Regions:
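Alpha-helical substrate-recognition element adjacent to the catalytic core
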Residues: 1-102
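C-terminal cap/substrate-recognition subdomain and adjoining C-terminal extension
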Residues: 76-174
Length: 174
């Protein structure tokens, strides 16, 4: 089955910050190429790195890798974000479920949906990219309990994916 990579959007491709008052997080991330302000109506303010997009396009094109959106952007990720920033994610499967979120009872919709998808699709290993993983104890426990290799990456929301994160991903899928 290969590797399934589950991807959030904000805090992954969009380094969240108010770009009117801050500079891109190039120094903190290791991405020295062009950074651009996010200009998509309704999105969080921030920057996106052309280097991150190129690296993720390379990862997504790797044989045996299937990428799926797991983001509150839902349909907006493949239809708005991906084409705007040049990410080859318009054809990635989008896993809906944000309407089912129940944080008051400690039930994070993303954990529910990734569990269901892993049980259904049975990948050999998974990569989970989300800037909120480390804040959900149930997600951290689930990742440790899985009987397949897992790489869970939780970037700082204001930085997004770093060069070191992409190196980890590329080594994991190799």
């Amino acid at each position: 089955m290969g590797t399934t990579l589950y991807s959030d959007a904000d805090g992954i491709y969009v380094a969240w910050s108010d770009h009117r008052f801050t500079t891109p997080p190039a120094e903190q991330t290791g991405w020295t190429g062009p950074w651009h302000p996010v200009t998509i109506p309704g999105s969080f303010p921030g920057y996106w790195s052309q280097d991150v997009v190129e690296a993720m396009n390379r990862v997504a094109g790797h044989p045996g890798v299937t990428v799926k959106w797991l983001t509150a952007w839902e349909e907006g990720a493949p239809t708005l974000l991906a084409p705007t920033i040049g990410l080859h994610g318009t054809d990635w499967e989008m896993i809906p479920g944000v309407a089912e979120d129940d944080l008051a009872n400690w039930n994070w919709w993303k954990l529910t949906k990734i569990r269901e998808d892993v049980a259904r699709s049975r990948p050999d290993r998974i990569v989970w990219l989300d800037d909120d993983i480390n804040f959900d104890p149930a997600s951290l426990a689930w990742v440790k309990e899985l009987d397949i290799p897992v790489l869970a990456i939780c970037p700082r929301t204001e930085h997004g994916l770093t060069r070191d994160h992409l190196d980890e991903i590329e080594a994991f899928i190799a």
